[in-house]
């Protein structure tokens, strides 16, 4: 099949991802609007946060590794087979985590949301095949279809059944039906029948393990901060915080649209010794990230309170001050994600692990101190401080990798 240009790939990926992220945000709007009180919003927030732990294990950072596999160490069949293995392991580990750390009322919503994320996670490896063949238009169209279906299903579940569990169940059903589209398109590019071999699975498992642990620890920073806020200040406070800060996640997702299609190009430039091209692309990417957040920051300063009041009502608008610390937190989260994925594409798994481990260790005392001192804003402060530490370490590792090639 005909490959698309880089600009076309970035456009389709951006449109689909932005729409998908917007629909995910609208879910948090709907749960706040259609539910009585903020308990359901708080429970959904916890389910989303816990699912991020599953996502790190299920994804196993394979997408970044896969699209930068310029020497084709593994086939599409092996990537798909390995993804099925990581989904199963991630599901079991996350269920155990939920049983230990979450209340009984949260277990069913968490389980259902994990099923939703499992479908999402499987589609990701298919999109990796699409990206390798420069057909990210398939990715964009898939996200448009899946987002529309899960948003409609979630709305029906809340509006007609007044049940968060029914609403999430609708998301699960619609997502699994939409996967048929992805399978149909991707198998036209490559053989995607799962291939599971002990030797290849073990090698891929051990190669990516440090990065996976690192990115799981990265997710723990956010999950722990939010859970502690809920324990210290109650579910309503967590619901308010999650509702106010969720629009910022869309901005954070925009950062991913910028760099995700470029990871293979970064890897090729580094592998072939074109250091000047690598550094130039790195500077352009970082500049684009700064511009995105600067524009959004100005927008929130100008109309943030009015926007929150219009969408969520006066109760949420009264807490509009949370959005500024949340924006800083989101910017740093995007930076950590980019630098981590970049190190993975350059095969520095240990650097990804070390940076995120130290950041996670910093987050525990920071969360206790800052949430106690600043309440809901303390959650964003603790995450931001942790991710500043991570970013400094990851940048140091990146310089160590690139500098010798630049000198040579």
Features from the language model and the residues they span:
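Interhelical loop/hinge segments that connect adjacent transmembrane helices in multipass membrane
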Residues: 1-2, 6, 137-142, 164-171, ...
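Membrane-interface junctions at transmembrane-helix termini in multi-pass inner-membrane proteins
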Residues: 3-7, 64-74, 119-143, 328-355
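Signature of the first transmembrane helix
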Residues: 4-60, 91, 151, 209-236, ...
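Helix-loop junctions and terminal segments of transmembrane helices
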Residues: 55-74, 132, 244, 248-273, ...
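Hydrophobic alpha-helical transmembrane segments
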Residues: 107-114, 140-189, 207, 358-362, ...
């Amino acid at each position: 099949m005909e490959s698309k240009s880089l600009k076309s790939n970035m456009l389709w990926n951006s449109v689909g991802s932005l729409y998908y992220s917007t629909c995910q945000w609208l879910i948090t709007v709907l749960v706040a609007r259609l539910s009585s009180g903020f308990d359901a919003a708080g429970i959904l927030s916890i389910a989303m946060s816990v699912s991020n732990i599953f996502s790190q294990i299920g994804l196993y950072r394979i997408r970044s590794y896969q699209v930068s596999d310029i020497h084709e160490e593994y086939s599409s069949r092996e990537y798909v087979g390995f993804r099925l293995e990581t989904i199963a392991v991630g599901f079991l580990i996350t269920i155990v985590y939920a049983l230990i750390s979450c209340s009984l009322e949260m277990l069913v919503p968490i389980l259902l949301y994990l099923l939703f994320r499992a479908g999402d996670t499987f589609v990701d490896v298919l999109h990796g095949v699409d990206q390798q063949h420069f057909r990210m238009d398939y990715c964009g169209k898939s996200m448009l279809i899946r987002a529309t279906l899960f948003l409609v299903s979630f709305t029906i579940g809340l509006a007609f059944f007044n049940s968060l569990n029914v609403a999430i169940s609708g998301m699960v059903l619609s997502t699994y039906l939409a996967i048929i589209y992805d399978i149909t398109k991707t198998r036209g590019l490559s053989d995607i029948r799962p291939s599971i071999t002990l030797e290849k699975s073990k090698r891929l498992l051990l190669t990516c393990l440090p990065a996976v642990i690192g990115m799981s620890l990265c997710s723990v920073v956010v999950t722990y901060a939010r859970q502690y806020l809920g324990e210290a200040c109650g579910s309503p406070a967590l619901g308010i915080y999650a509702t106010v800060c969720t629009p910022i996640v869309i901005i954070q997702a925009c950062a991913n649209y910028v760099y995700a299609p470029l990871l293979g190009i970064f890897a090729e430039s580094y592998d072939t010794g074109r250091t000047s091209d690598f550094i130039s692309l790195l500077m352009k990417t970082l500049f684009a990230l700064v511009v995105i957040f600067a524009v959004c920051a100005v927008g929130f300063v100008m109309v943030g309170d009015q926007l929150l009041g219009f969408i969520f009502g006066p109760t949420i608008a009264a807490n509009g001050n949370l959005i500024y610390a949340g924006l800083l937190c989101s910017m740093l989260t995007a930076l950590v994600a980019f630098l981590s994925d970049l190190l993975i594409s350059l095969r520095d798994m240990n650097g990804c692990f070390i940076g995120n481990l130290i950041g996670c260790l910093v987050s525990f005392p920071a969360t206790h101190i800052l949430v106690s001192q600043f309440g809901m804003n303390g959650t964003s402060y603790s995450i931001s401080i942790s991710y500043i530490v991570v970013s400094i370490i990851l940048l140091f590792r990146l310089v160590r990798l690139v500098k010798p090639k630049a000198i040579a």
